[in-house]
Design a protein with these regions (language model features):
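Donor-binding and catalytic core of enzymes assembling or modifying cell-surface/extracellular glycoconjugates
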Residues: 1-68
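Leloir-type glycosyltransferase catalytic cores
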Residues: 57-175
């Protein structure tokens, strides 16, 4: 692994970010900014939910599962927003609001990476169901963001995509 082989350098960081097919980011500022400035696609496995990077049409993302400590159930999309954790970025904030973050499964991550690879190579076949789910997801996302009554909107035009397979397998989550 590049980061642990002892050959890491600032030049190689920039070179790899500029030349990669895509970058896998686990959230927060950091390396993914390098591929971003070179217009390379990013796969985001992201929290906080309200701060999904939506401005690059080549980006794909999923979010960690939000589990209620009280009911032990996975929260729906709108429940994440109504639980005051959509913009939280520290584990302490989630704990204070009674929410546990559950990492995405290896299958969920693999599905997202495969989708990105298929999109880049022109092999991805978007279905009518996928288009409908993307529209429903982003519409619900924008509605919930408006309810936060922020002084200034966090997102302009939404260009990114949420993981299609994740949406297909979690349709009840989008409400």
């Amino acid at each position: 692994d590049y980061a642990y082989l002892g050959m890491r350098s600032e030049f190689m960081d920039i070179y790899l970010g500029a030349k990669c097919n895509f970058c896998i980011s686990v959230g927060g500022p950091g390396f993914y900014g390098i591929p971003f400035i070179f217009r390379r696609p990013n796969v985001h496995i992201q929290v906080p939910f309200g701060l999904l990077p939506t401005g690059n049409k080549y980006d794909l993302m999923i979010t960690k599962n939000h589990i209620s400590n009280k009911s032990k159930k996975k929260l729906t999309f709108s429940e994440i927003f109504s639980s005051n954790v959509a913009l939280c970025s520290s584990s302490v904030d989630f704990e204070l609001n009674g929410i546990k973050l559950e990492d995405n499964s290896p299958k969920e991550i693999r599905d997202l990476v495969v989708e990105m690879d298929e999109r880049i190579n022109g092999n991805y076949k978007e279905t009518n169901e996928d288009r409908m789910l993307q529209k429903r997801f982003w519409s619900t996302y924008e509605e919930n963001m408006k309810r936060l009554n922020l002084k200034k909107p966090l997102h302009g035009i939404i260009k990114a995509q949420f993981g299609a397979k994740f949406l297909r397998e979690n349709q009840n989550w989008i409400r």
